[in-house]
Amino acid sequence: MAHQFAELMFTQSVKAAQEQYGSRARLEHFTAMAGPNDELTEREAGFIAERDTFYMATVNEDGWPYVQHRGGPPGFLKVLGPKSLAYADFRGNAQLVSVGNVSSNDRVSLILMDYPNRRRLKILGHMRVESSGTDLPEYVAKVERTVYIDVVAFDWNCPQYITQRYTESEFALR
């Protein structure tokens, strides 16, 4: 368990639940031994570059969470630096729920999955949206917005209960 991630996620209510269900002492031990995990390393950058999908959560001004799936070619989510991610946002269904949500609360949570290898990376950050085109020139399609995420913390999650799933190309390699 990453120290910075636990600092942000383990609120008093969460700690009370951990205490009630008997996991608090174990999690305190893991957190105390862990590094801060507030800067992406080559390990995270490589994992992110291989992903062709992720899930992103935002919260609206009424406190309702919204989870969105984002997909593209492998590597469409770019690591710009040890604390910075970006992706090109193309025209979709025009609901703009996530874009609207971050105008009042810029906090965002991402989950990136590697189903075949049962790996999961959770990222917390602050999101900003720029409509003025893109500085991600490798995209040929019209980019409506560029989404930037300032990474605050991340955590690698245990593989337990991750159901293995394969794309056709991944299955062919087995």
How would you describe each model-predicted region?
Residues 1-174:
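Binding-site signature for planar aromatic cofactors or substrates
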